[in-house]
């Protein structure tokens, strides 16, 4: 807001443009997926497969899915519940960010797309960011698989 920055990378697309608009500043988002970056999962739960309780993790992921469905299906009620947890959330910025976050939720958070992970690894190799791809089983597991 100080006018000292022309661009940022890694900003939260649901907050920064809303904050700028509230402050009367114009902004534009460059969507990474429109600039050649393959689609990737932004929120990944991490657990040690050697020590995790698979049943607990499965139930947690299922609860996440049910909560996501409730939020999407009941945006006003879910906003009231969320914003009711802390007074500092009850402002225009957070209300706008909530609205802009809803379409970004994965309706099936447990879904595991092997191809997406392999495509992103290939992108990282081709960009010189990693030296080689790894077997998908060494970097992620499908917690819903038996």
Regions found by a protein language model. Give the residues of each.
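Secondary-structure end/capping motifs
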Residues: 53-129
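Conserved C-terminal helix/tail region of periplasmic/extracytoplasmic solute-binding proteins
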Residues: 121-146
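Poly-acidic low-complexity segments
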Residues: 19, 31, 74, 90, ...
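A generic structural-conservation signal
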Residues: 9, 29, 92, 133-134
